[in-house]
């Protein structure tokens, strides 16, 4: 295909960017002034006010970590997308930066959609993102018209940027509207770009482009087509090499699949983010060697983006409130990101994702409970009122007889709680929200391998923030992220055993510091 990659960027300004950014800042500030903090996170990244979704433009640049994110600054529902921005020099203490992008060009007049950041050969950063317009010029009833855009920062602090314009147009006869979320990397002496596409036949694909100068791009081929004909779009694609401890390299293709059907424990969310591991030769199609696997098995995880800081592959995900009711929309804000996770390729041939080592620096006070034994249907309160904590615990599977055992978090006086447990009958870790007083309910499960079950112990790291929980199983072999809307009053954490006994080999509870965004 040719004719849709211009020789030079194309742009048509329809609004003043500085004025649009000032209006967006005022919109966020108005909602922040009236924000209810009952579920607002203490150690997760969220906007000061308004709606957020996908993490964007993740990078470590000139000594600072930068996290951008999709932002609607005028409401707590999805709306015209901007790019919010926070930065940190240590991943522990974050500061709010000016909003980076507002939709001001004809090519993006209905939204500055998701994209990535990459450092060029000259050491300077470039932003690639999707410009979004409604195809009928009015609303979503006529579908999308989406193109790929380029911008460059004005300073090393990344507090503002200059939009260069459209670099890849959309061949409308080859695409069923969806055409977005560019990811750029270098292999050998060429730059490559991929993004998600819904083909004219409504098949979810990732297209591959190449460039010598990061500005002029040439279409190469379809990098990957999802084998499931129900999947019509691959949002927020990711693509990166990774080596195991022995130095053997694989390629990972990640995407958020739209159209997957639930089957048993798999794909229970409206859309599901996952990956495949395989091989890739530049210019060729990706060759998967594994089935589709979920990045995260919780209720609320979507649109992850990873980046390499020179030593580690780090990923953030969006804790996505897809299913109504969404109580936090009444509080002046909606949505937060997960903790940053390091991706590693384990000896088992699968990816592991665990909180980056820096997260240990958020711990303030630690209570070491040592070993704990609970009798049949036993219960022990380990925190009377836990606003923001991390729990490390190891369950002795061989010595425990409980059918389910674990932690009731956000346990309030009205009887509401969220349950993080090991279910012996199904051999899985569960987040169960059946006792939640507010928000969506249901449960999600993370599988344990036969090897893990046979090991005789289960290690859990449970991060509890004001309105969400993240669970890491056996050093990151599985991860789970879910919202948990606590009722009013003290929020206890209780260790429980159901229909049997529980033996805990070790349990520590750490209170967590704020990351400075409250």
Tell where the protein language model's regions lie, with residue ranges.
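Beta-rich accessory regions
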Residues: 3-4, 25-31, 246, 279-518
């Amino acid at each position: 295909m040719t004719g849709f990659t211009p020789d030079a960027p194309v742009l048509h300004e329809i609004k003043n960017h500085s004025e649009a950014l000032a209006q967006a800042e005022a919109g966020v500030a108005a909602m922040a002034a009236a924000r209810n903090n009952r579920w607002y996170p203490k150690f997760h990244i969220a906007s000061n006010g308004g709606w957020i979704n996908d993490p964007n433009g993740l990078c470590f640049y000139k000594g600072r970590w930068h996290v951008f994110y999709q932002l609607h600054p005028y409401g707590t529902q999805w709306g015209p997308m901007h790019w919010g921005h926070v930065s940190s020099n240590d991943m522990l203490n974050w500061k709010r930066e000016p909003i980076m992008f507002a939709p001001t060009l004809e090519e993006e007049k209905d939204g500055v959609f998701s994209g990535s950041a990459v450092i060029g050969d000259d050491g300077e950063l470039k932003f690639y993102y999707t410009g979004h317009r409604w195809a009928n010029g009015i609303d979503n009833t006529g579908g999308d018209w989406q193109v790929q855009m380029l911008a460059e920062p004005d300073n090393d602090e990344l507090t503002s940027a200059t939009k260069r314009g459209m670099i890849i147009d959309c061949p409308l006869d080859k695409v069923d509207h969806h055409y977005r979320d560019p990811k750029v990397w270098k292999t050998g002496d060429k730059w490559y770009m991929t993004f998600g596409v819904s083909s004219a036949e409504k098949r979810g694909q990732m297209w591959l482009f190449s460039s010598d100068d990061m500005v002029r791009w040439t279409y190469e081929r379809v990098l990957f087509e999802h084998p499931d004909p129900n999947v019509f779009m691959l949002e927020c694609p990711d693509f990166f090499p990774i080596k195991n401890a022995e130095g053997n390299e694989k390629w990972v293709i990640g995407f958020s699949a739209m159209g997957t059907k639930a089957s048993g424990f798999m794909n229970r969310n409206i859309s599901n983010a996952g990956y495949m591991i395989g091989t890739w030769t530049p210019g060729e199609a990706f060759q998967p060697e594994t089935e589709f696997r979920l990045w995260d098995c919780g209720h609320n995880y979507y649109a992850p983006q990873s980046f390499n800081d020179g030593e580690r592959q780090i990923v953030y995900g969006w804790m996505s409130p897809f299913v109504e009711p969404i109580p936090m929309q009444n509080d002046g804000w909606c949505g937060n990101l997960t903790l940053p996770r390091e991706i590693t390729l384990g000896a088992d041939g699968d990816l592991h994702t665990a909180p980056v080592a820096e997260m240990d620096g958020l711990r303030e006070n630690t209570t070491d409970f040592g070993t704990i034994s609970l009798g049949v249907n036993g219960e022990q309160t380990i925190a009377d009122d836990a606003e923001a904590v991390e729990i490390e615990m190891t369950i002795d599977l061989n010595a425990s007889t409980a059918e389910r055992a674990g932690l009731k978090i956000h346990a309030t006086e009205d009887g509401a709680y969220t349950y993080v447990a090991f279910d012996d009958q199904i051999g899985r870790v569960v987040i169960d929200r059946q006792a939640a007083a507010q928000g969506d309910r249901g449960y999600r499960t993370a599988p344990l391998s036969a090897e893990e079950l046979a090991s005789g112990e289960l290690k859990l790291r449970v991060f509890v923030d004001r309105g969400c929980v993240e669970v890491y199983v056996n050093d990151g072999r599985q991860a789970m992220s879910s919202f948990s809307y606590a009722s009013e009053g003290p929020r206890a954490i209780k260790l429980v055993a159901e229909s049997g006994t529980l033996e805990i080999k070790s349990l520590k509870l750490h209170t967590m510091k704020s990351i400075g965004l409250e």
